[in-house]
Amino acid sequence: MFLDIDACLENREPYYKMIENIAAECFMPLCYGGGVKNVEQMKKIYALGVEKIAISSQAVINRNLIKEAASLFGNQSVIVTIGIKKDVWGKKKVYINNGKKNAKLNLIDFIKEVEFLGAGEIVINSCDNDRVMKGYDIDLL
């Protein structure tokens, strides 16, 4: 899985040439995520040799994107990445925009919804453990 987390932060298109170069050298199924906001971008990325696309913030903002992508490309090609942070009381909350904005969603309900909409895989990411070298959030799992 190749995630360009800066694409979301910088509100820019994916770097298609970079994706093409990585896909050309990758001899295993490749998943790309970062800055993907619509099916037109997905079509370009799949055409470059990527097998799966991960969406995160857009899965919250535009849930229809999950359904549309699954319908066009197949459930196996759509991955939803869910960012999780604990609040001051230790409750797990869904966050978007690289862990900067609380989406105000119930985690379990959202997981069920994205599965129903057609996500073939769901990746849970503990934003609290990003870049701190503490390993997996076992309690979250």
State what each model feature region is:
Residues 1-18, 57, 123-135:
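Glycine-rich, proline-tolerant flexible connector loops at the mouths of alpha/beta enzymes
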Residues 5, 18-21, 29, 58, ...:
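Intrinsic disorder and flexible coil segments
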Residues 10-31, 67-83, 134-141:
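Alpha-helix-loop-beta-strand connector modules within alpha/beta enzyme cores
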Residues 10-14, 34-37, 61, 102-106, ...:
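Short secondary-structure boundary/capping elements
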Residues 16-19, 23, 39-47, 63-66:
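Generic internal hydrophobic packing segments that stabilize the cores of diverse globular domains
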Residues 26-53, 139-141:
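Catalytic cores of alpha/beta
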Residues 46, 50-124, 128-129:
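Conserved anion-binding
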